[in-house]
Swiss-Prot record:
Subunit structure: Homodimer.
Protein name: Adenylosuccinate synthetase
EC number: 6.3.4.4
Cofactor: how bound: Binds 1 Mg(2+) ion per subunit.
Amino acid sequence: MAPSPEGVTVVLGAQWGDEGKGKLVDILAAEADICARCAGGNNAGHTIVVRNDKGEKTSYAFNLLPSGLINPECTAFIGSGVVVHVPSLFNELDTLERKGLKVAGRLFVSDRAHLVMGFHQIVDGLKEVELGGSSIGTTRKGIGPAYSSKASRSGLRVHHLFDPTFPAKFRKLVEGRFKRYGHFEFDTEGEIEMYLAFAERLRPFIVDGPTFMHNAVNSGKRVLVEGANALMLDLDYGTYPFVTSSSTSIGGVVSGLGISPFAIKRVVGVIKAYTTRVGGGPFPTEDLATVGETLQEVGAEYGTVTGRRRRCGWLDLVVMKYSTMINGYTSLNLTKLDVLDGFDEIKVATGYKIDGVEVEGFPADLDRLAKVEVQYATLPGWKTDISNCKTYQEFPENAKAYIKFIEDYLGVKVQYVGVGPGRDQNVIIF
């Protein structure tokens, strides 16, 4: 199903990330005029495999650039809420073009987007070392420190690259980090020279971000927004402090792109059929025994950006209800349902209790969250390979029952079901 003829369609991660948003974005982007990123940086990551007329496969890796670029008729936009590491942007751009994907004239970057500098990446690593056993588990791409500079009103934005005062502002920013972390090895003047050289190459891509989006929406363009990370990593609503540094909720779409909330017509929540998480932080349904190991192996649960093993466990509908409440999903994309094919029984978390008392909502206090006793419902498995299913009617009855259980609990319909990694392994229910 294509994005709305007019207005904005948003695809958001509903758990802790790695739900498979890129695959749905790839499908929806085929009918989109504009595909936009609203938050995060090159800490997001997914790979799209495209088969040509001869059956030959080409893999395209996306980290910072919107994956809607796969559609040659789609324009990509990096919004004001994104933090941009310019060398990585051009490295990704050049890699895509070497593989035959023509991007020229189809990519635009908001002049208000903040810049990620080399020293941000160094500081990211220093902070992780400083935290030691309490490490959050960042990708060390400099995303957090860049957002920190932004929040402290000392950051540099894309438009600053063309300001004669850029070198002085850059030196001042580096000196501030030296005072905080000591004098780490960093070539300040070399970085300035590199960025000034990149500035001229970047110039044709730069637009007034809010005006660009306003004109797109008002002219009836079909806009697809590719959310980064997921709700449970949101700075305000995630398991703080084990979160990312940006707003990954529906609110981040509005602020990150500079659009009216009334422009948004569809919000698709992407939910994995079980739960995974990378890095530290609470994970109530995590399974450290056979179930977790099976999900990790069968689901090939390794981080796209870092290669780290993802922690695995049963689907947590308490998390999903909280996520649905905040983001207001109009439909769901249930991914990797095929990973559950081999289980005799499948558990689903339906509630939390602390000292025998049912918990309402999702606890903000991590000490309190650590005490929850997860309440599970047990559903029968289907023990059938569903990877070749093309329609909902082809699913085993127990797989249909699993989908319905999720829908009934959340009050939201499942629109798409992923049954394998391929682009064509996606069942559209309505």
